[in-house]
Amino acid sequence: MARDMSPVLKRCRALGLEPTFLGIDKKSNRNFARAGKKISEYGTQLREKQKAKFIYGVLEKPFRNNFDKAKKLKYGTTGENLLILLELRLDNVMFRMGYGRTRTEARQIVDHKHVLVNGKCVNIPSYQVKAGDVISIKEKCKSAQRYKDILEVTDGRTVPAWLEADHENLTGTVKEIPTRDQIDVPVNEVLIVELYSK
């Protein structure tokens, strides 16, 4: 599957993004403030889009597809709906529940067919979960050292209120669809809408 392979910390610096939003504890040695000429309105809008794509690990075509889907929804604002759709990706939900140290690792776990949604194997990272969905690691995979190592890192993280995770049994439930104030990504979605509306 194609994805952005640029060095993570370098990309974070370019976007003014703290690595912790990606699940990475490493700190950049450089200051996040970037000197130079003032960014244009278009440049600011473009950077917000790039930031959202980078956080969720989504390339342009699927990102645009999510935007078009968000635009057609009959409720909420397009920008908020876009972020909600990105949050409801299976790879992101796995990351949020603590079953991946990063979204990239969570995506690999889904790709490798370790994940069940309502008892059925799903290996599509972009799969959209729904309220009430029960997500679990396959029984034969639960004893793998990989998950012990992951939980050593993620067990102390706060699971969002719209999700429930049972780390002992490697399961979780989507309690509800998240609202914008439950999504902690530092993205101004209004600027993304303005960019695509040009």
UniProtKB/Swiss-Prot annotation:
Record GO terms (molecular function): rRNA binding; structural constituent of ribosome
Q: How does it assemble?
A: Part of the 30S ribosomal subunit. Contacts protein S5. The interaction surface between S4 and S5 is involved in control of translational fidelity.
Please give the organism: Lachnoclostridium phytofermentans (strain ATCC 700394 / DSM 18823 / ISDg)
Role this protein plays = One of the primary rRNA binding proteins, it binds directly to 16S rRNA where it nucleates assembly of the body of the 30S subunit.
Q: Where are the coiled-coil regions?
A: none
SMART domains assigned: Ribosomal_S4, S4
S4 RNA-binding domain boundaries: 88-153
Question: In its UniProt entry, what is this protein called?
Answer: Small ribosomal subunit protein uS4
